């Protein structure tokens, strides 16, 4: 039996599920009567999406469909950071959607402080873009997971728990 147990708190999403949601979004935009002639283009890069269309209203409709498709693919809506809609040339508008992945130093510090203040039997250490919680007892780790889940709404980021051992 190991002398200590641990798990990692991370903020990630399944890239393939996002690609699938974007493909579904493109198909629906091509088929919907109100969006068919809007010249809407959705491009996906490593850490952002760009939506280009004729009007703000069309972009808002595409945004709603994106959120709906992401929900159906079990993606957290907290991964999307919608930027301001910008006007670009040719009577077109564009919106950049940044994709949140990984824990920032600030959020890692807040989570670490939360765990240290409320749980005396576990330790938290920041490891790059994740946070490792270690304790001698599995029950203490379960309590730490429950504590973090209760406070998750304070952090505007999707949290997952991995490597529970």
Swiss-Prot record:
Family: Belongs to the YajQ family.
Matching CDD domains: YajQ_like
Name of the protein in question: Nucleotide-binding protein PMN2A_1813
UniProt GO MF annotations: nucleotide binding
Function comment: Nucleotide-binding protein.
Annotated source species: Prochlorococcus marinus (strain NATL2A)
One Pfam assignment: DUF520
Keywords, sorted A to Z: Nucleotide-binding
Gene3D superfamilies: 3.30.70.860, YajQ-like, domain 2
GO cellular component, one term: cytosol
InterPro entries: DUF520 (IPR007551), UPF0234-like_C (IPR035571), UPF0234_N (IPR035570), YajQ-like_sf (IPR036183)
